[in-house]
Amino acid sequence: MKFRGQGTTMETVQRQLLKNLSLKIAGVFFVAGLAGAVLTMAPPVYGALANVQISGYVFDLTGSPLSQAMVSVKPGANHQGADAVTVFTDAEGNFRFPASVGGLANPEQQISTRVLGYEQTRVTTASMGDAQKLTVIMRKTTNVANTAPASAWLANFNAADKESLIMNCVACHQVPAPEVRAYAKQIADVTSSDPEQVRKAGWTAIVKYMNYLLADRFGPEGSSPPPDANSAYAVGDTDVVTNILAHNFTGPLQVLDHYDYGAPLAVTPNTVIMEYEVPLPNTIREAVLVGSPRKLWAADVSSNRMFSIDIVTGKQEIHEVPTNGPMGPHSLLRGADGSIWITALFATSVLAHLDADGKTWHTWPLKTQKGDRVLIHDLSFGRQHELLTDKKGRIWFSDIGNSAVGYIDPKTGIVENFKAPEVAGRSGKASLYGLVMTSDRKHIWYSQVGNGIFGSFNVETLKFEKSVVLPSATSGPRRLTISDQDIMYVPLYGAGQLIEYDTRADKQLGIYDLPDRGSVPYSVTWDPKR
């Protein structure tokens, strides 16, 4: 097919679009350079401006205060501690950074403020002794494209298209992230008598590229042969997804007139977010805070590495998980003793445990007595979100590779798994994913993200018991949590909903729409204090 005024084939258009694509897309989509944690403690400060306390106000051009403004700062090059700190304004527009930030040499460059529907125009500073007072001025904008979340662009999708796109793409990156929107603009800029075909060609090219890049970045170091762009993990049905993209993203995606969060942000003026940058290359996707003094442990899924980060000083150390092959530390779970349990992404199939001292490792190969490999996603935990064994001391897990539940006896190394029953009309990759254990330590509940099912298994009788089939196969039940009363909460990743389920009564108590049905709830955690 030829394009009017272009004299190029469809394949040439695909190659040119990919050539123009910024290489930054790989870093943003697949390399999480920042491992973040929400903290409330204030570490000590170092440097010439160490004793300076930073606070301030956020106003619009009329002088009206802006509440729940997200104010972020990047300390200077010689700082110690977090590489970025974020706080939020109160109802009067006031904000205050923890003392650990210290003074700022160039606030105009170091301060970044985010408010839906506004853009930062100016930051002024007034220094008074050991205090630095900032005034941030924001200007209202009619285009909220740069401040609204990616989910804002999904508001007009029908439910089926939205769920399908989320289930296929958003596990790896937001859609449409800024880089995706930039790519959409490149597609829209192609002059053609058949723009729909251009869109299909462009989105087909990028979906294949994403599949290849994901497999390349998440594949174990030194793996061969190179991943196949047509069959790598991620988008299972390229045609379906590219048709959804081509049908719904018809323009350059540079202008968005309106978005509403639908609810207040889940923050207060006392909320502090601290982020720590880990040197590239890495593929960090999960971290856990343990130990005394507290350290943030982050898993690099593209290697066998764990990073430990001192949250006070920012000092980092690299720890290699002692295995004979590629592991890819994936899911992390605290033990009640302050230790860390680590599951593997790759088919090496090992379970690792790091003692509370942060030095002593234990690993177990994961093969059943029949010789079958297992691929753990989640380990059993209860209301404390800490490892919870059954009464025999067995650790239960979700086996995403075999759509099964199973256990390992850490004393003997014996591993056994039990494949979840198939459900009529729900064929395809079930992907048994999340896992929680009830307080009686007799039952585990699991989710199957790939086919819209969650259910229970009796760890004493070794039998599956309850199976709850959700109306939509792409609703996406994912990482579960459970309360002290054995009330389970199931996030529906694809549908943007939350299920409340009484595991003792085997009864669903409710299903709740999130304020933004495209916000993609991946995981939930029980918080007894709030």
Task: Show which residues each predicted segment covers.
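Extracellular beta-sheet/turn segments enriched in Thr/Pro/Gly and aliphatic residues
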Residues: 126-149
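Conserved beta-strand positions in repeat-built beta-propeller and related beta-rich domains
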Residues: 297-302, 342-347, 390, 395-401, ...
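Structural motif
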Residues: 53-67
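Short, acidic Ser/Thr/Gly-rich low-complexity loop/linker segments typical of extracellular
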Residues: 77-98
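A short, solvent-exposed loop/turn motif at the edges and junctions
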Residues: 78-80, 103-125
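Beta-rich, blade/repeat-based domains predominating
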Residues: 280-293, 324-337, 370-392, 423-441, ...
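Short loop/turn segments that connect beta-strands within beta-propeller blades
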Residues: 310-314, 355-359, 409-413, 458-462, ...
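The canonical Cys-X-X-Cys-His
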Residues: 166-177
